Each structure stands twice: as C-alpha cells, then as structure tokens.
Amino acid sequence: MCTQDETIFVLHDQQSNNSAAQSFTNFIFGDSLVDVGNNNYIFTLSKADSSPYGIDFAPSNGQPTGRFTNGRTISDIVGEALGAKSPPPPYLEPNTEANTIRNGINYASGAAGILDDTGLLFIGRVPLREQVSNFEKSREYMVRVIGENGTKEMLKNAMFTITIGSNDILNYIQPSIPFFSQDKLPTDVLQDSMVLHLTTHLKRLHQLGGRKFVVVGVGPLGCIPFARALNLIPAGKCSEQVNQVVRGYNMKLIHSLKTLNNELRSEDYNTTFVYANSYDLFLKLVLNYQLFGLKNADKPCCGGYFPPFACFKGPNQNSSQAACEDRSKFVFWDAYHPTEAANLIVAKALLDGDQTVATPFNIRYLNDL
C-alpha cells in the first residue's frame, strides 16, 4: 500500500515525458556555503538560524532559513537558472523525503568537512561520509516509490553537486587549541588525505547511481576576512600562505577527477565529473571587485572584522541595522561567507563560462547532456 506521499510520487512519475525532461533535480552535498538549514536540526555552534541571516532571501520574506548568507547560495542560483521550481530542502527537515524525486535534497552541513574530524570544535555537524550515507537512505525511499529502474533513470539525469573542503583547510591553518589540537600533518599529507577521502565518496555516489557531478574546488581562503585577520593581512591583500595550501589541494583534486572521468566513463559513457574552478573566479572577484560593480571586498557586511566575527542582530536593532547599508555592494557577508551579490557573479560564470571556469565543460552543458 502506498502512503499519501508515495501516491503523489507515483502520479508525478506518470506525468508526460516533456515535463520530466524539463525538470531539474539536484542532490547537494557540502558545507556552510551550500547548507540551507540542516544545522537547524542538530546541536551545533555552527548555525545561521537568526537575523540578519536570510534578510534578502525572498522565498522566506527575509526570515533566516539556515543559509549562511544574506540571500541565495550559488546552488540556489544555479538551480533557478536550470529550471528548478524550488531549492532542494534540507535532508534533516521533517518529511523532506516528499521532495526527493521532484527537486532533490540538500545534505550539506555547516562546519562539515571531507575528513570526519573537521569541525570538531563546533560540536555538531554532518561530515561528508555521513551525508553520502543519508543519500543512500534517500535512494532506498526512491526505490520504494518508483522502483529500481525508475530510480536509476532519475538519478542518471540528476545533478550531484559537491562543495566541500574549505573547513578542512581552515581547521588546518588555525592556531592550535589545547586539548583539541594534534600535531599538524605536513601540508601535502593533508591535501592527499582530503583528495583520497573525497574520491572515495564520489565513487560511492557513482555506485549509488550518480552520473552528472559538479565538484567545486576550494576558493581562495586566504582572501576571506577571517583568514586575513588571523594572519594580519592588510586591506587589498590575501594570505599567500593560506592560498598556497588551497591551490595545492585543488591541483590534486583536478588530477583525481580526470582519473575518475577516464576510469568511470569507460564503464558508463554517461558519467562526467565537472571541476568548478571557484578559486580563480573568486580571486578575480576579490582583486577586481569594482569591475563587477561592487564597492567592498575587505570587510564583512555583517559582524566584526576581528574575533569573534559574530554576525547577529542586537537587542535594540532591526535586521537592516545589524548589517551594512548596501548589501548588494559587498563581496563578503560575514567573515567566512560571500554575499548573494558575489554568489550571483560566480554562479553565472559556472553556468555559462569556458574551460578556464569549469572543465571539461560548464554546468549548463552538463545539465543538457
């Protein structure tokens, strides 16, 4: 016997092929750059469930949703451009499985990393390994509703977006904290470990049916207000030491994705891993922000420039007073995350840019395959 939700999905699956072909399904994995509210449902110090977060997010009328920015994430913007009727809901939201086949699901979690121990100081978070396990549970639900063959066909056409790795590197560059710290690994060992674990999770997602993957490289973390303050970097400059760690990881990731494409496409030509070059995109934006119509790439729009970097609404403030006056002109929303304005610029480039932006081709081309 079908439940009410299952009946809805059976009916949905019987709709015309034209409607199905035009739909956009996205399964999103990652950290706070793409978290849309999973951390609202766990005990964690990494939350964005209070004002002024979400102040410019129209679907919630400016109320916080758990997004770590003032408006839309890059995944939100890409989804809209490719025809999504609404963003994939957070996996941990009650009854969220009812959206699995229609829109996909968002498994991302603020403070999460590729490595399980990343984000330990924030207490609660959902590491990538656990996010993939949660997708496996979602897949079991799909099979119950539309069968194994229907699930395989749906997943073959769905997008799998992975945006993670920043927290692993941010944890690495932070000063050691007594009782929580261990001897730091050599940089190349950290990078190799990140790539190895991420590759393992990507292969697992492929085994579960994923065929269209967008793997986002780590951005220039040496340019975010947090890292610049930590390293006493003056305005207009970035920490080259931090960015060097990021570049080394990204280069190894690119090599791994090329290997995956060669290996897995020989088994199934539908398989494609796209590398999204967020590093060069965001670095160009930070260093040339005025060319993009922005006015500030140094200070966060909300919260302090020095510890504790908190972005919150004071007791006698409204949401607008807690943030900068013109949010559409800032690159950074808080000390760690970009504004919707910056996300728009990066998302548009990833959608339609050339091979310097996304390789072997851009996201729109991948979606149309």
Curated annotation (Swiss-Prot):
Catalytic residues in the record: 32 (nucleophile), 334, 337
One BP annotation, GO: lipid catabolic process
Membrane spanning stretches: none
GO molecular function: hydrolase activity, acting on ester bonds
Superkingdom assignment: Eukaryota
Enzyme's top EC category: hydrolase
InterPro entries: GDSL, GDSL_Est/Lipase, SGNH_hydro_sf, SGNH_plant_lipase-like
Catalytic activity, EC: 3.1.1.-
Keyword tags: Hydrolase, Lipid degradation, Lipid metabolism
Xref: CDD domains: SGNH_plant_lipase_like (cd01837)
Entry's family note: Belongs to the 'GDSL' lipolytic enzyme family.
This protein's name: GDSL esterase/lipase At5g41890
Biological source species: Arabidopsis thaliana
